[in-house]
Structure formats: C-alpha cells, structure tokens
C-alpha cells in the first residue's frame, strides 16, 4: 500500500522547479517526485499563497490548505515534507508532532540556522519515534556512491587534498558539499577559518574555510552567485584526481600512468 504525503511549502523545491518542464525528463520538486513514485501518493499541500495552492490543486488533483491545522485535521500522512524557508522549520516541526506522529518528516536543508535549535528538533523526533531526514540528496546520487566505493576500495588513495566551490551561503548551500564530503571522507576532525567572507541574507555567511576530514583536507571557497553559479569539488590523491562538477552531473576520474616521454 502506498504511503500518503503532505507537502508544506509550495515554493521552488516544493513544486515550482519542474512545474513547466516535461515530467518524463525533469523531476526536481517534492510534488513531482512523490506524485510519480509508485510507493507514495500526494494527500495534500499547505501554503499561504492562494495562487500556489490553486496550481497544486489543478496539477496534482489533491487539496491544498492555507494552514497546517486544517490539513492535519483532514489527513493522516505517513510522510510530511517541510519545504518552507529555514526560519519556519522548527515551528512547523513542533506543530506536526503535537498533532500527529508520521513515519517520516523530510525537512529541507538546513534544518536550522541555529545549532541548538537543530539539536532540539532531532531530539524531539527521537522522543516521538519519528524518523527525521534532511534533504541532503547528493550522497544518494549513483555517481556519488560510485566515488565512495572507489575511495573505500583504495582506488582513490587517501589522504586526499581538495577544493570545494560553493555560493549562496555556507549553511544554505555549502552544507550540501560538506555533507557529500563527509560521506566520502568521514567525519570532520577540525576546521580553520581562512577568510570570514561576506554575509549572505540574514542568517548565513560565505567564509573560506579549511576542513580536515578523517580521510583528507578540503578547502571550501565561496564564489559569486550574483555573477554566475559554480559548484564543484576537486580531490587530488596519490593515485589520481577526481572532479565533481555541474552539481554532480559530470564526475571525472583521472588515474595516474607512466609518461613514456617525461
């Protein structure tokens, strides 16, 4: 039996990114992903904006509500997606847990801009027996999993040295690559601030930092999103070089070999 899903927040990641794209080729939003997966079905959505609600109703033939209480009084979801701006995550999570006990809460990243708040959210879900997942999806990509296998097998020898480019805030966007590198290289052991960088929005910064993981050291550098987008990771090993570019759509491994001339 398929699992019922409620989506809270019908912005870009909730519904908008792929709204006008071919559904056979493009799946970038929670709404489309859950609607197409055979093991899930959309129960409802929640958003303050009436226009967004109407689009959801017309596109997915499911109801949409202006407030969470109304949705939870009518539906008992197995999965609740929190796809609102970060500052509302904790408030919404607590309201969910006060009313129902879903199997899973899938929250957009970052969980919170405040570490203590994030820890409280995690503990609250543990206390209620609810699985809390944060949408750091890059480590689930087949290419990223293959890279991890290459590192685990020793094909990519460690320790590595690397650079990761990010923009739009270290917490908001850079954390995607921090999470990916934790997946590849193990837990963070230490970090050093190179340059504080500028403030991004109300709650984030774009520092340059050096992070030491269990299997190597990576320098995170902030790019300039207002001029162009650039998200990439390059790792050097004694056995070669791995490049992760275009947000993971291109991954290139170059192994070492003897040069017959030099």
Residue ranges and their predicted role:
Residues 53, 121, 147:
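Aromatic/hydrophobic pocket-lining residues that form π-stacking "cages" and hydrophobic walls in ligand
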Residues 1-59, 182:
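N-terminal Rossmann-like dinucleotide-binding module
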Residues 142-161:
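Rossmann-like NAD(P)H-binding beta-loop-alpha module
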Residues 78-79, 85-86, 90-139:
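Beta-strand-loop-alpha-helix segment that lines the small-molecule cofactor/substrate pocket
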Residues 158-234, 247-248:
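Rossmann-like dinucleotide-binding domain that binds NAD(P)(H)
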Residues 7, 234-262:
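C-terminal glycine/acidic-rich active-site capping loop/insertion
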Residues 63-68:
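Short acidic-hydrophobic, aromatic-tinged amphipathic segments that line or gate anion-handling sites
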Residues 45, 80, 105, 162:
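Receiver (REC) domain switch-region micro-motif
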